[in-house]
Amino acid sequence: MRPEDDRVYDVIVVGAGHAGIEAALAAARMGFRVLVLAVNPDTVGWAPCNPAIGGPAKGVVVREIDALGGEMAKTTDETMINIRMLNVSKGPAVRALRAQIDKILYSRTMKRKLETNPNIVLRHGIVEKILTEKGKVKGVVDNYGIDYLGKAVIVTTGTFLRGKIFIGRSTFPAGRMGEFPATKLTESLIELGFEVGRFKTGTPARVLKRSINFSVMERQDTSDEPLAFSFFDEPRVLPKDYPCWLTRTNPETHSIIRQYLEFSPLYGTVKLIEGVGPRYCPSIEDKVVKFKDKESHQVFVEPEGRDTEEYYLNGLSTSLPYEAQIKMIRSVKGLENAIITRPAYAIEYDYIDPRQLYPTLESKLVENLYFAGQVNGTSGYEEAAGQGIIAGINAALKLRGESPLILKRSEAYIGVLIDDLVTRGVDEPYRLLTSRAEYRLLLRHDNAHLRLAKYGYRVGLIPKWFYEKVLSLERRINEEIERLKKVAVKPSDRINDLLTSLGTSPLKESVSLYHLLKRPQLSYSTLKFLDPNPMDDPEVVEQVEINVKYEGYIQKMFEEVAVFEKYENYEVPYDLDYDAVPNLSTEAKDKLKKIRPRSIGQAMRIPGINPSDISNLIIYLDKKKQ
């Protein structure tokens, strides 16, 4: 590399958290030279809050990232110490994996993957300014005054934009505990026209393992079933060396919290925190204030890794003073002698209004400037990583001169996430939930590769052999379903006795294995006794069983998707003059001008746009086409 090339790159990624990692790796693997600027290169992919990946909806996102060619699932498999499948009894639409990771090893592994990629340079630097020229991004300036030039810039700053930590009435600037904040970049974004807001989040205290009495807590071991996040990895059973533990708060805990509320930066007499916090991950003082009737709340005591004695107190996030934290924690069963190694804290930070972005995550204000992760108003490692890979892919595709990758709401949770952000915006930290996805029975944990591998292959992040494997799987699933339709089972005493013993009604006439499998009491494995040629591939069997048992619901959902696609494919010109559209309400005009929806479908999802506005818009567009 020539010395002058050391400051010139194709893509510059600002930040090396979960969004930055996926963005950098995607762009680099698609053939572009990438610079990653991190406040601290030793905390790449850090898990500053819970040491876990996955959970409802979020676990599906991890698999979607994997199907697109991302890294989060693989690194989770490499570093996990405890893994479980959640919501097994609730059906396939809401099942999801959640793994405890060794957070130190996870970070080291991700750093290594960035450093060993020949197209990536990982470097320390706090970005202070975005450079632009004629409405197009040109590069960045760091805290040393160094100009780095890039054709595209991806901002993934997490909680670092003017980050401020709160512990009681003590407050100090930080991107997270022990790390410098980015104090000047927000000013640069505001100068470029970006609307900026303020959110807050928090994390619990960490306590020393030897000070915990696990004997009075409920043990939660890793799964007995072989599991893996990545479709590229072989599922395995982990040793039961790192269980999680469940305990609960009690009335004494809540009394201590109420006693110290006046010193809370959120509820105290001196209100220090103005930012809105996450609804679905409230602090313990939030729970005590808002749910006065609850006598206890769950606390999960989780290991942070193999080579550390620190445990994470999931459920005890707080910004109360240190003295209050000690008393509160020691009032909990099993934590009576707990030694705090790191105090809990709240952190307030800047985010941009994501309605200023296209669905590609490119800014509407500055060409080739992308944003991903918490800077867009989301919460969660998985949500950040999902945005990161999309931003990285789209930055690379634009530099190639190719069409962007925009995942629909009917295709992926990542599509739901990004559409919600750019269409509806955020007034609190956004967390993905299964309830946000209208088509969640189609967006399952088990079929992410069947849904998305084609896109990963198209952009060059998925190898040909894996894509062919997915196509083969799809073919074998369809062939097996057709075979089951053709295999008839005739009534007999033996068969009817078997069916009765399984809790289902006996046969009165010949019926196919396909129709028998629809019965809720029967599974593919129980039908093996009636099947002359059963399939032994568990992946095929799982897909066949879900598709047969839920056929009616799935078919209905596909019909709904067809209606959805009709409006999604009805394009709205970006430069449409909404003032020229007759009979549009003033509110509709204002919101349509701000969002500039790419389709009628997206316009329909903008809050405040009513059906008559949509009808008037369609009438106007139809007339323009004539």
Swiss-Prot record:
Binding-site residues for FAD, renumbered to this chain: G15, A16, G17, H18, A19, G20
InterPro entries: FAD/NAD-bd_sf (IPR036188), GIDA_C_N (IPR049312), MnmG (IPR004416), MnmG-rel (IPR002218), MnmG-rel_CS (IPR020595), MnmG_C (IPR026904), MnmG_C_subdom (IPR047001), MnmG_C_subdom_sf (IPR044920)
Any one of the GO CC terms: cytosol
PROSITE patterns: GIDA_1 (PS01280), GIDA_2 (PS01281)
Subcellular location: Cytoplasm
Entry keyword S-adenosyl-L-methionine: no
Taxonomy, superkingdom: Bacteria
Family of the protein in this entry: Belongs to the MnmG family.
Gene Ontology BP term (one): tRNA wobble uridine modification
Entry annotated with the keyword Amino-acid biosynthesis: no
Function of the molecule: NAD-binding protein involved in the addition of a carboxymethylaminomethyl (cmnm) group at the wobble position (U34) of certain tRNAs, forming tRNA-cmnm(5)s(2)U34.
Molecular functions (GO terms): flavin adenine dinucleotide binding
Leader peptide range in chain numbering: none
Listed PANTHER family: GLUCOSE INHIBITED DIVISION PROTEIN A (PTHR11806), PROTEIN MTO1 HOMOLOG, MITOCHONDRIAL (PTHR11806:SF0)
HAMAP family: MnmG_GidA (MF_00129)
Gene3D superfamilies: FAD/NAD(P)-binding domain, GidA associated domain, C-terminal subdomain, tRNA uridine 5-carboxymethylaminomethyl modification enzyme MnmG/GidA
Names of required cofactors: FAD
Positions annotated to bind NAD(+): 277-291
UniProt keywords, alphabetically: Cytoplasm, FAD, Flavoprotein, NAD, tRNA processing
Protein name: tRNA uridine 5-carboxymethylaminomethyl modification enzyme MnmG
Assembly with partners or alone: Homodimer. Heterotetramer of two MnmE and two MnmG subunits.
